[in-house]
Structures are given as structure tokens and as C-alpha cells.
Amino acid sequence: MFADQIRNDLAKIKSKHLYRKLKVIDSVKKNNILIDGQWLVNFASNDYLGLSQNKKIQQAIIQGIREFGAGAGASHLISGHFSCHDEVEKKLAKLLGFEKSLFFSSGYMANMAVIGGLIKRGDAVFCDKLNHASLNDAAVLSRAKVYRFNHLDLSFLERQIKKSAEKNKWIISDGVFSMDGDIADIAGLLALCHKYNAYLFIDDAHGYGVLGENGQGIFEQNNQRLWSKKDLSRVIYMVTLGKSVGVSGAMVSAKKNIVDLLIQKSKPYIYTTASIPALAKGVSASLDIIFHGQMLRKKLKRNIELFRHSIKNKDLLLDSITAIQPLMIGNANKALRIAEALKESGFYVPAIRPPTVPINTSRLRVSLSSSHKRADILHLSNIINQVMN
């Protein structure tokens, strides 16, 4: 019976120390969150520039509610596409150098929309083994032939491409890998696309806002500005709006005809109520702050360097220069115990366990922000050093 299966599945998950519970946050004060009556310094948030607490962005959202109401009321293609959606799409496209952008309610939805709307049976999809779950799910659902290459191994990827017989080839990768914090080789991936007439889809959820001189993400970080038609025609680029941008949603940028095709064929875009218009107003304000946010990014870089320098056991650290700083533990139960010890000391650092990461690679994922205080980073590092000693 299905009821027995549910009980057995839950019991099995609990026995492996993989059972998850929702943490209810009752209040937020900058980097501090209130959980179960205890104030904790939050080192789990993807709000890398602290913009979710920015007053200008908050005021833009409030003004958007006054102008357009609390909700869109319809899908984009019916009567839910407002001027603020249109304006922020044009703003991001101009900032990035793409011809057109499209607003989605979430990054997961955007990835499903792109892969499901553009890739089909008979195509070949090449995915990094550590890609986000949404990319993996979408690739399988596309019914294309899916190849998975070893993490960041472009030689392995090229061998796969050479062996593939499919006509249309797609390379799909995270920009910044969410569990390890390392960065894709954009120049290398683009070179393979040109060499083998392939297309490149990049999910830069954790790169946009923090990478590049003007915060424009992994392409700017790698000096791969997409002004040439040669590059632009091959790249589709997704950024989320709930991490560094500090609001909610996602946008996909590409050549105009590609985005136009998504509007025609992408079911996750067509068959859902449009994102709240006021959020688009907040995103627009945030994009301006990000473009001129060199000081925020410098502060974040200093915080990352301070944290890595302060951890005594360097073997715990991965090779990450980004705000995502995993501490490799291995055993899931041990990771939970350490996370609880940090919580008792006033810090919220989640234990990341399978199936989010491979078996025996459980970790603590420290997420740093430009708004973290030096004293809090040093205190956290000191507690980690004591617990891991």
C-alpha cells in the first residue's frame, strides 16, 4: 500500500540522518535571524550583497504595489505583463549586452523553460555532473540524449562531443557551482561551442551581482563580453533575482529570436501567473545598485579572504574564491552535530547532506555577504576551529 511506502521511505531517510525539517524564521535584522526564540547570525543566506535589506529596493517594491497592486492577476501572455516587467527586461539586456531578456518567477522555472522550450528529442545535451538539480531535471524531461561530463573536465567533455552523432548540441553548466563554490571555465566552454557548432546555456545564479567589475557575472569575470554576433548567437544566460539581486525571480537573456521562441513555446512561461509586478520594480532598483556596487563587492571579497585565512585546517576548504565556502565533513550525522554546535554558539550554518551532495561528501556551507561584520566572521571561524580540533 502507498501509505506503507510513505512510512518506510520516511523511516529510511531518518535512519540515514538525512531527514529535513523546515526552519521557521520569525524575524530578520540585517544578518541576524530569529529561530525558535534564538537570535542567530545567518551564514546560510544567498543575499551576498545584503540587498534584501536595502531601503531603496524596499521602497521601489512598495511603490510598485501602489501602482500595480499586490499581484499580476494573469499570465504574461494574457494581461499579466506590466510596463515594469518590460522595463527591467530591457535594462538587464542592455547591461549584459544581449538583445533581449525575459522575466520568470524562479530560477528553477527559467531553467525548465529554456531547456524544455528549445531542446528536443534528437538533440544532445552535455551537462557538468555537479550542475544544479533544475538543469538535470530539465535535461531529462527534454527527451534529448543526455551526456554528463566529469566536473570541469573539458577534455572529457570534448571526447563526448566528438563521439556524439546528434546534430544539435547543447553544453549546459552552472556559472558558479552552488555546493562547491568553484567557477566554470567560460572561455573553454565557448571555444568548444565554436569548434563543434554547439550552443551554451549558463545558469549564473550565484555569479551575477558578485562577479565582474560591474557585477555582471561570470562572462564579465572572464572578460568574455558578448558583443560579437559570433558569441551572442551561441549563448543563453540565466540569472536569478533572489540571491545577489535580493528580490525574487529570474531572467533569461539571449538573441531576440531565441527569446521570442521561448515566449511561443515555453510552457513554464506561458501557463503560469506572471511574477508580482512590484518585484520587477525592486529588481530594477537593485540592478542599478549592483552596477555601481564596486565597494560592496570589495567588502565581500575581503570577507571571503578573512574567512578562508581564519580557518586553521585548510583541508576543510574547497578551492572557492566565491561567497560559497563549503567545509567538507563527509559523514552526514557528523555534519549535523557540528551545525548544531554552531547554532548553540549563535551561528546558523546549515549541514548540506545527500541527495543535495554525493554520499560521504556532507558539508557545512558557509555563505558570506558583504554585510557580514568582521567580528562575526572571526567569531564563527574560532568556533569552527574549536569544534574541528
Residue ranges of predicted features:
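Conserved PLP-anchoring active-site segment centered on the Schiff-base-forming lysine
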Residues: 114-133
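Conserved PLP-binding catalytic core of the aspartate aminotransferase-like
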Residues: 299-305, 314-346, 356, 368-370
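Structural motif of enzymes handling amino- and sulfur-group chemistry
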Residues: 274-293, 299, 303
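PLP-dependent enzyme catalytic core of the Aspartate aminotransferase-like
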Residues: 55, 59-63, 67, 94, ...
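N-terminal "arm"/small-domain region of PLP-dependent enzymes with the aminotransferase-like
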Residues: 2, 7-8, 12-68, 198
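Short loop-beta-helix segment that forms the pyridoxal 5′-phosphate
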Residues: 75-81, 89-113
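Active-site PLP attachment segment
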Residues: 214, 220, 226-261
